[in-house]
């Protein structure tokens, strides 16, 4: 009887943990998707320093006075398919 109760409690704990983990994962994915929606996707697209970011972690490069900013490709990482 004690063994059955222990197994039942363990099963409930495992199911609760799995459900909580899936909910957190879904929330994290929604946040990541919303971040990707607010970024510049194309290479050499216009970005703003401290404002609209480039997607996939690409840098936003600006002129010396902080104007004429554009997203530049990450050649090493994208060329090797790491990003």
Swiss-Prot record:
- Could you confirm whether the keyword Disulfide bond appears in this record? yes
| Name this protein carries in UniProt | Omega-agatoxin-Aa4b
| Distribution of this protein across tissues and organs | Expressed by the venom gland.
Task: Please name every pair of cysteines joined by a disulfide bond in this record.
Answer: 39-55, 47-60, 54-71, 62-69
The positions making up the signal sequence are 1-20
Annotated propeptide span(s): 21-35
Q: What the protein does?
A: Antagonist of voltage-gated Cav2.1/CACNA1A (P-type) calcium channels. Paralyzes insect by blocking neuromuscular transmission.
Q: Does the keyword Disulfide bond apply?
A: yes
What cellular-component terms does GO give this entry? extracellular region; host cell presynaptic membrane
Enumerate the UniProt keywords alphabetically.
Calcium channel impairing toxin, D-amino acid, Disulfide bond, Ion channel impairing toxin, Knottin, Neurotoxin, Presynaptic neurotoxin, Secreted, Signal, Toxin, Voltage-gated calcium channel impairing toxin
- Annotated source species: Agelenopsis aperta (North American funnel-web spider)
Q: Name one GO molecular function term.
A: calcium channel regulator activity
The UniProt similarity line reads: Belongs to the neurotoxin 02 (plectoxin) family. 03 (omega-agtx) subfamily.
PTM summary from the entry reads: The toxin with D-Ser (named omega-aga IVC) is 80-90 fold more potent than that with L-Ser (omega-aga IVB) against Cav2.1/CACNA1A (P-type) channels in rat cerebellar Purkinje neurons and is more resistant to proteases. The epimerization is done by the venom peptide isomerase heterodimer.
Q: Where in the cell is it found?
A: Secreted
């Amino acid at each position: 009887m004690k063994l059955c109760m222990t197994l039942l409690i363990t099963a409930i704990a495992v199911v609760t943990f799995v459900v909580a983990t899936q909910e957190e994962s879904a929330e994290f994915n929604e946040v990541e998707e919303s971040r990707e929606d607010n970024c510049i996707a194309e290479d050499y697209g216009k970005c703003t320093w401290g404002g609209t970011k480039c997607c996939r972690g690409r840098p936003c490069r600006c002129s010396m006075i902080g104007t004429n900013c554009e997203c530049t490709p990450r050649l090493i990482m994208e060329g090797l398919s790491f990003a």
